[in-house]
Regions:
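Conserved structural position within tetratricopeptide repeats
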Residues: 50-53, 92, 98-99, 139-143, ...
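Short coil/turn linking the two alpha-helices of tandem helical-hairpin repeats
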Residues: 66, 71-80, 117-126, 158-167, ...
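N-terminal leader/linker segments that initiate helical-solenoid repeat arrays
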Residues: 23-77
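Structural signature of tandem alpha-helical TPR/SEL1-like repeats
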Residues: 41, 78-92, 125-137, 165-179, ...
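Alpha-helical adaptor scaffolds
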Residues: 116-117, 129-131, 140, 144-179
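Terminal, low-structured helical/coil segments at or just beyond the last alpha-helical repeat
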Residues: 200, 208-244
Length: 244
């Protein structure tokens, strides 16, 4: 395998890990889930589309649409083609939001999350270019809103997963993740990413504290992802630490 192709695979792997670490926390905040969630997402999207058709396009509606498409891709669809199309729709709505207001931090973050998730499903083509574009939008989101917990988490995840030659830095990763947690600790995936980094560094005691934070959180953001992904992962990592 050529060095260029190896680099491409590494980049798309990093892209995938980064997007998997955030995409379940990039959409609409369903603090209290409808009984038929995630099927209810299609109903929400239809209502939003009807409002846009009858009342016109507005910034908040584009943001809401991007968030809904991300949730549909993450939580409802199972087939990769459907997921990719939903991610692309989310990216397009976020792009249109940025055309209306470039200084919208959430739109930059949503574009990065959706674009990265869509490209992850396509393969290695243009992986380096896409990764650079994603980092640019995440940086801009943080520049506009230094307390944007999700963007801070995503940047921390990128620094944690990228190799040193491609700009990775465990020190920067830890800094961004701690900033994300300080901004809003109920985004529990930031605790998970930081815990994995601390385990890698042999800092088991600190890692356990963050895993406990995932398990003991009250009213986590995105309870669907927390219940199905974040809590089980924290339990698995904590069990492995305690048995080692």
């Amino acid at each position: 395998m050529s060095a260029r192709r190896q680099c491409g695979y590494r980049l798309i792997a990093v892209l995938g890990l980064a997007c998997l670490s955030l995409s379940a926390t990039a959409g609409v905040e369903h603090e209290s889930l409808p009984p038929d969630y995630p099927d209810s997402l299609e109903r929400e999207l239809a209502a939003l589309q009807a409002k846009i058709a009858t009342q016109g396009v507005r910034l908040d509606r584009l943001i809401a649409g991007a968030e809904l498409y991300l949730d549909i891709a993450d939580d409802l669809f199972e087939e990769d083609t459907q997921k990719r199309l939903a991610y692309e729709a989310a990216a397009e709505m976020a792009r249109r939001a940025l055309l209306m207001e470039e200084r919208n931090a959430q739109a930059h973050f949503l574009y990065a999350a959706a674009r990265g998730s869509a490209e992850r499903l396509k393969g290695i083509a243009n992986a380096g270019l896409v990764l650079g574009e994603i980092k640019e939008h995440v940086r801009r989101a943080i520049e506009l809103d230094p307390g944007h917990a999700q963007a801070l988490q995503m940047m921390g995840g990128l620094y944690a997963e990228l190799p040193w030659l491609l700009g990775g830095s465990e020190k920067e990763a830890e800094s961004y993740l701690r900033r994300a947690i300080a901004a809003d600790g109920r985004y529990t995936n930031a605790h998970l990413i930081l815990a994995r980094l601390l385990i890698k560094q042999g800092r088991s005691g600190e890692a356990r504290a963050h895993l406990d934070a995932v398990l003991q959180v009250e009213h986590p953001h995105y309870p669907y992802a927390w219940k199905r992904r974040f809590r089980p992962e924290a339990e698995r990592l904590l069990k492995a630490l305690l048995s080692s």
